[in-house]
Design a protein with these regions (language model features):
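RNA-contacting regions in translation and RNA-metabolism proteins
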Residues: 1-147
Length: 147
């Protein structure tokens, strides 16, 4: 709370232990999820979640320094990440159907690593398409390819 409380007077922080990133892997880290809730917090999200990703990076770095070990922390603001994940999964399924029908690959816009991962996971069992990340740095994007 102290770490994030300075950001807004009316913000509350809800903390919970999340599900492991890879439920099939018993050694996968279990994240600490912090959801900052309150009015007028869009500035914490920023354009396409860039400010939120930066905030999460800073919090992880501060906690790692304090605790002298890495801590898997996921920060969300008014459930932005949950909503964005749902949007990405719906978009992935919609574009996968277009790729399957047309038989031609389609590249998505450049995305952050966690968003690309969401696309890969959403389509990993799709019978008609496969995914591949292409490009470098902040220009890296997912291409959906017919099988």
């Amino acid at each position: 709370k102290d770490l994030l409380g300075f950001l807004s007077d009316d913000a509350t922080v809800v903390a919970r232990i999340g599900a492991p990133d890879e439920p099939d892997d018993p050694g996968a880290p279990t994240p600490l999820e912090l959801d900052v809730q309150g009015g007028d917090l869009g500035f914490l999200i920023g354009h396409r979640g860039e400010a939120l990703s930066s905030l999460q990076y800073l919090v992880r770095a501060l906690l790692a320094k304090q605790l002298k070990r890495n801590v898997h922390v996921v920060i969300d603001v008014d459930s932005y990440r949950v909503k964005r994940r749902e949007q990405l999964m719906a978009m992935a399924r919609r574009i996968a159907e277009q790729v399957a029908q047309r038989g031609k690959p389609m590249s998505l816009e450049p995305m952050a690593p966690d968003e690309r991962r969401t696309i890969h996971i959403a389509l990993r069992d799709h019978p008609a398409v496969r995914t591949e990340s292409v490009g470098e740095g902040n220009r890296r994007k997912v291409t959906i390819i017919p099988r």
